[in-house]
């Protein structure tokens, strides 16, 4: 006689929450869907939320990033702006999305990592380090993220 054990794995949304502009949107939508949320941030980005579990890590160059990667599992959704975090989360079987609604996939992560490396090398070569920063976030940006995120939640 064989016994088949079905293990139910619940998806969790894990947010690399240091300076993430879509924490509230993702948390609200996850709550509607009944999906747990974990927000990971360092001590300089304290969050308060009645639904999400907040993981506060020490300040450090990769503390939050490594916690996100170590926490995620196959089937989870990871929200991050960091290509390195996305690459490691994808390797663990997580689905990854950035704050603009772009999906990180096995098909695009290598080229994104290569572009990041090239841009970093160019910045090191240049004596001018004038970084403009991201453009101001709009309601359309939030809507684009929301649409893509809902699509991931419903997979």
Located regions from the model:
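Nuclease catalytic cores that cleave nucleic-acid phosphodiester bonds
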Residues: 8, 12-155
